[in-house]
Amino acid sequence: MSKLKELPLSALQFYATAPYACSYLEGRLARSQVATPAHLINADVYSKLVRAGFRRSGIFTYRPHCDDCHACTPCRVVVAPFVPSRAQRRAAERHQSLEALVAPLTYVEEHYQLYLLYQSVRHAGGGMDHDSRDQYEQFLLQSRVNSRLVEFREPPESESAGRLRMVSMIDVLEDGLSSVYTFYDPLERKASYGTYNVLWQIAQAQALELPYVYLGYWIEQSRKMAYKAQFQPLELLVNGEWRRFEDVAPAAARPAE
């Protein structure tokens, strides 16, 4: 993790939050380091912060700052040499007919209802399954950086023509795309929407000639976060330096050949 003095952001201040229940590892306490003031964090500054391991939730920019745990490791896909695995190719083929519409961050009631359904099925009891409209908007639709909303729908010729399947929020950085949050139809048990979404972002970054897709934090002990290791080549931010996944990750965490 980069030291504060290494950040070329002298106008910003950083503070640590009080401990709170970790949302990834049960029974653990977490703390975050928050960058302030929010109004100074424009797209250029945010790009630098992301390279230093920060993420954002609405207008709040943060990174893990836990007392006795370092499980959250920033990760990014190197897109130029990326080759999908067999399972990823199957996911791409299964969902390639979905129509993607890129738009500014905008409230749509249909999106909000899908978000509530996703939270109630995939993260029941996590606290977000009862988010109000205001909480939803503050979490996903407030941004001071270069952000996009992408919705994925069934094509007109399908049996479920126009049905909303997935919504993704993405930030455009100087050196890549940053995946903010994605939610999708959780009732389609055989679908691979999450995998397809990452593949779609990688393809977009390649088309834009951006070198990376930032996927947030890789957490080996968390099933919800460990999947990111399936997208190779992956780099991890360790001791302030971006290094190849295979050079720093435990052998057991590496994807099968």
Curated annotation (Swiss-Prot):
Keywords: Acyltransferase, Cytoplasm, Transferase. InterPro entries: Acyl_CoA_acyltransferase, Asp_Glu_LeuTrfase, N-end_Aminoacyl_Trfase, N-end_Aminoacyl_Trfase_C, N-end_Aminoacyl_Trfase_N. It comes from Ralstonia nicotianae (strain ATCC BAA-1114 / GMI1000) (Ralstonia solanacearum). NCBIfam families: PRK01305.1-1, PRK01305.1-3, PRK01305.2-3. This is Aspartate/glutamate leucyltransferase. It is an enzyme of class 2 (transferase). Pfam families: ATE_C, ATE_N. It is found in: Cytoplasm.
